[in-house]
A protein has these predicted regions:
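Generic, well-ordered alpha-helical segments
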Residues: 44, 95-98
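Conserved Radical SAM active-site core
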Residues: 1-89, 105, 110
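Alpha-helical context
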Residues: 79-82, 93, 116, 120
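Conserved C-terminal portion of the radical SAM core fold
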Residues: 98-140
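Generic detection of long, well-ordered alpha-helical segments
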Residues: 9-16, 96, 130, 134
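A short acidic (Asp/Glu
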Residues: 63-66, 89-92, 125-133
């Protein structure tokens, strides 16, 4: 089973301690977003988890726990979004310069095949025009 953690809520950035507790306890419960009464228990034991995909804009809060994930036998990689959007659109993400530094640290530790850079979503507004994206993308 592949655990997608999580495109909806950025678990590494905001819920790292919760995720590590779930892995230690070996399970989590998931509520069906279309039927709130349907709750499923998912085993998170390493023998049942083929890989964990961490979707994040800020992996730094999870990084202190990576040795523990390794020692427990979890296989994982990061889909790492770096955008550099203006604060009006993305107030909770670290600055692009900081995330680029974190990306380098994570790639050094895990290897380039386990840290995938993403530039999305691409949003067009009066502030983030096509020209903004061309200029913003270059230094990243």
């Amino acid at each position: 089973m592949i655990v997608s953690a999580s495109r909806r809520s950025d678990i590494p950035a905001f819920y790292a301690e919760w995720m590590v507790r779930r892995l230690k306890e070996g399970f989590c419960t998931i509520t069906n977003p279309f039927n709130r009464t349907q709750v499923t228990t998912i085993s998170l034991k390493p023998e049942y988890v083929d890989a964990i995909v961490f979707w994040t804009r800020n992996p730094r809060p999870l990084m202190p726990y990576l040795d523990e994930l390794d020692s427990r036998g979890y296989r994982y990689y990061f889909q790492f979004t770096i955008l550099g959007y203006p604060r009006e659109l993305d107030p909770k993400s670290p600055a692009a310069a900081n995330t680029a530094e974190t990306f380098g640290e994570l790639a050094e530790r895990l290897g380039s095949r386990r840290v995938i850079w993403r530039y999305d979503p691409i949003i067009f507004t009066g502030i983030t025009t096509p020209a903004f994206h061309e200029e913003n993308f270059q230094p990243l």
